[in-house]
């Protein structure tokens, strides 16, 4: 890991490079933020939101936690979601999980992870609910990847069930919720094919995604 003084030097170079490319960048950024996107992702250091979608500061409003979980009792996450939708008026909310997620791996195993076990119970609940879809896959890495995908769909549904999103839809605000997965092995995002812009479309879209997963397993 770089020593701390080097981080300040890196920051100076980054700021100088930004000003060289766009002299008004920081003045414009300081005046206000108008992100179109909200990103709910994993805290994993290999999955930095802005970098993997190629957007500069000011374009994405980000909330991250272990295994990209959305819980209706988590005031941290709900406050970020409410600010993004009600104040910033973001149009797209992206729930992005990733393959190789340590939280998902721990949730699928019987190993204890300490305090975070309590948090990962939410992911273990997803694994129990969809055990058949997971256990149809013979190899452990494939099962872990499948749980990462199922977890995204579950958290997407949780977002859509929040009063924040449902109230926005009720007043006619344009909000679309997306489920994506990121592969740390090749750096590519994959769309899980679920985009929800009205509450009544949620369950049909999620059930269709489950059916596609079922059909993707031979035999």
Segments (PLM) and residue ranges:
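Glycine/charged-rich beta-loop-alpha catalytic/anionic-binding loops adjacent to active sites
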Residues: 57-68
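Short beta-strand segments
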Residues: 40-42, 64, 94-98, 178-183
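Divalent-metal-activated hydrolytic enzyme cores
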Residues: 1-35, 67-91, 102-219
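Gly/Ser/Thr-rich loops at beta-strand to alpha-helix junctions
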Residues: 44-46, 98-103
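N-terminal short beta-loop-beta anion/metal-coordinating cradle
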Residues: 18-59
